[in-house]
Amino acid sequence: MPVLLPSTDPGQDSRVGAPEWRQAAKATSRKAHLLTDRCGQEAVTMWQPKDSVLDPNVAHHLGRAAYMEPWRFRVEMLKGGGTLEKPPPGEGVTLWKGKMKPPAWYARLPLPMHRDARAQQTAEVVHAHARGARLTAARLGRAQHQINGQLRLLLRQREATDRRLSEVRKGLLINQQSVKLRGYRPKCEKIPDKADSLLVWEKKELKSMKRKMEKDMEISEDLLKALASCRDTLDFYCQERLQAVELMNQPLDKVLEQAGRHSWVDITRPPTPRTQGLKTPPPDPIGTYTPACAKALFEAKRLLMESKDILTEMAKNEVDIQNQQQEISNRVCSSLAQKMRETLELKERMTMTLGLMRGTIHRCMKFNQEMYVTRGIIKGPLLKRNLEAREKLNRPLVRMYQRHVGTQLPEATRLAQGTDLLTRHNLHMEKNLKELRTTHDNLAWGLNCKKIGHDVDYDVVRLRLRQRHPHVCYEQAQRLVNDWDPPTPARSQTNTASK
């Protein structure tokens, strides 16, 4: 007997449930499916890579395949013809079995280890701040040490420059004393010569050196103040940073070695031989390396470079001025020595002339005395009774001869003429002797003046050689100028010269 089976394709009319009931069930199922997808998607997005957002306009499987493509290993060809698979660069977990390297995932919600993670992050931040403070303190301390070294060099150079300035001032005092001492020469020796011109030139050059050295001292003083201020600023910032690292037991030099930098200020020294050093970090107003620290280090670097140039210039000026001052002093001393030699030559010539004149005066005096005796002999005796018989004109034979007017004897006339001639000659000799004596006295006074001038020049040279010795300080030379007063020439010599 045939059996009737129900149709497998249920028709619209064969359904028992109501359509509303069926639509409600489908809506509930669809709503649950959407809720499941949304919740699953939200649960996954709480723990996924940062750039894992897919394009909504692309199918899910296509977007996922495109997103996972960079995770796969790269195949590189070797020189020998083989291949080598390498994971892609970057952070992530390498899956060697699956030949993939997905990127690191980040959680957006706190996990069970959230408290420990936050504590670890806080410790890392604090330790990073302490390390940064320690590194900054090490940099500031090293910069302060270099500034201190530059300060010591500058102070030492200032002492050398000050000693040279004292020598220049002492040279001015020696020049003043030389001019003052040469002013005590006799008037005839004060005719301006090359030695006086050299003394004036020496004074001018010494004043120029003095101004130059004083300018160097002023520049170095300003630089010294700037270096001291920079050192105090670096010390303040260093002590401020050391408050955060006073419990850390690592020396600051070791920190600089770990950073790969020996100094952030001295750029002239060779770098520390390391593979790679840390660069100077950018200034951070709320970090350990603040703009104030950066400004202090930059100022220290600038002052260090400027001080090196100034120290080089000061040392060069000191050596040049020392050589120039020595050369000028030697020229003045050689000029005075030449003047002394010329004075000695003139003294020898004047001494010879004075000796010849003395002999001439003696001969003239002797001849004059003889002429006076001759004049007395020619004039005859004073009394008549002392006449000889041959000298008497009242003899009988003579009176008989003189009876005629034309036969008068010329004896008396010729005796009177001879006596008058001798008298005029004696007067002329007296005049010549007076001129000779006056010239002799003037020559003797000139010789004495030459001797005084030679002695004064010798004293000036001796004074200059003694006073320019390094053991003679500026105060000793100053006391000599203020207290010592050489004696003036004698009054009798001055009166003799006026004659």
UniProtKB/Swiss-Prot annotation:
GO terms for biological process: flagellated sperm motility. This is Tektin-like protein 1. The keyword Transport does not apply. Residues 201-225, 308-328 form a coiled coil. It is found in: Cytoplasm, Cytoskeleton, Flagellum axoneme. The modification Phosphoserine is found at S14. The keyword Coiled coil applies. InterPro entries: Tektin-like, TEKTL1. Microtubule inner protein component of sperm flagellar doublet microtubules. One of its GO terms (cellular component) is axonemal B tubule inner sheath. Signal peptide: none annotated. Its main location: cytoplasm.
